[in-house]
Swiss-Prot record:
Functional pathway: Glycolipid metabolism; diglucosyl-diacylglycerol biosynthesis
Presence of keyword Metal-binding: no
Key words of the record: Carbohydrate metabolism, Nucleotidyltransferase, Signal, Transferase
Annotated protein name in UniProt: UTP--glucose-1-phosphate uridylyltransferase YngB
């Protein structure tokens, strides 16, 4: 009987240099998107997908991530004393999202190495990997979409979306022989190809379901691009021996790995909040009018 996906890994050891100076003294994963730190959206997606245990791969100066997902007796006492029961309940729910564990990636040797750090936590079970630079908003959680495919095929599954031809060099791109509905069979993966070399315009979007056999592959592939251990290289090795599937993700994806993407995510997620929507729309309309008037001068 095929094992269910119960565990997830969230790599969060990066330095966040694109967001300096904001990340000089705090992790980029803790930067707010409206009123939640970015990593909370990722943890919530995992929990809503049915994940029970989450391992966050951290590094130096990441202690605030652990504090965020822990209980805070002082804060809870303060909220209780002030009668802020709804806020108190919300804070307590953060600590109860899942069983969250932590381990440090002692060297910045790439995504594949970060995944390899989770080997003892995962054991011989299938598991999910969620990258913190991609926030997905969808009716069915993005990870759940992948897990449903895994339940059918039992193979590695990657989450994908179509991108513009000029953007293929930013992503891992799949080579596929065809699809059944939203599911592709993957023949190969190419990491950040030029538009001329790209086998398709279907890009990997930071969500994976992997079998534990990936660990032995990661140990043998050696270092790839950037002198780092690349997860894409390991998946290419798997492709040569057995099928891999890709799930075309339904929903909106927000790339918060750069400043503009982070701003877009905050704006659009803010528009989804009923208490903010009308005022935010009015503000954006006013900005557009002012900027348009300025441009026409």
């Amino acid at each position: 009987m095929r094992k269910k996906v119960r565990k997830a890994v969230i790599p969060a050891a990066g330095l966040g240099t694109r967001f300096l100076p904001a990340t000089k003294a705090q992790p980029k994963e803790m930067l707010p998107i409206v009123d939640k730190p970015a990593i909370q959206y990722i943890v919530e997606e995992a929990a809503e997908s049915g994940i029970e245990d989450i391992l966050i791969i951290t590094g130096r100066n990441k202690r605030s991530i652990e504090d965020h997902f822990d209980r805070s007796a002082e804060l809870e006492f303060n909220l209780r004393e002030k009668g802020k029961t709804e806020t108190l309940k919300e804070m307590q729910q953060i600590a109860d999202l899942a069983n969250i564990h932590y381990i440090r990636q002692k060297e910045p040797l790439g995504l594949g190495h970060a995944v390899l750090c989770a080997e003892h936590f995962i054991g011989d079970e299938p598991f999910a990997v969620l990258l913190g630079d991609d926030i997905m908003v969808s009716e069915t959680p993005a990870l759940r979409q992948l897990m449903d495919v895994y339940d059918v095929y039992g193979t590695e599954v990657v989450g994908v979306q179509s991108v513009l031809p000029e953007d293929v060099s930013k992503y891992g791109i799949i080579n596929t022989s065809g699809s059944q509905g939203h599911v592709y069979e993957v023949n190969d993966l190419v990491e950040k190809p030029s538009p001329e070399e790209a086998p398709s315009e279907i890009a990997v979007m930071g969500r994976y379901v992997l079998n534990s056999s990936i660990f032995s592959v990661l140990k043998t592939i050696g270092r790839g691009a950037g002198n780092e251990i690349q997860l894409t290289d390991a998946l290419r090795e798997v492709c040569r021996k057995e099928p891999i599937h890709a799930r075309l993700l339904e929903g909106n994806r927000y790339d918060i790995g750069d400043k503009l993407g982070c701003f877009k995510a905050s704006t659009e997620i803010g528009l989804m909040r009923p208490e903010m929507r009308s005022q935010l729309l009015a503000y954006l309309e006013d900005v557009i009018k002012r900027e348009t008037k300025e441009m026409l001068r």
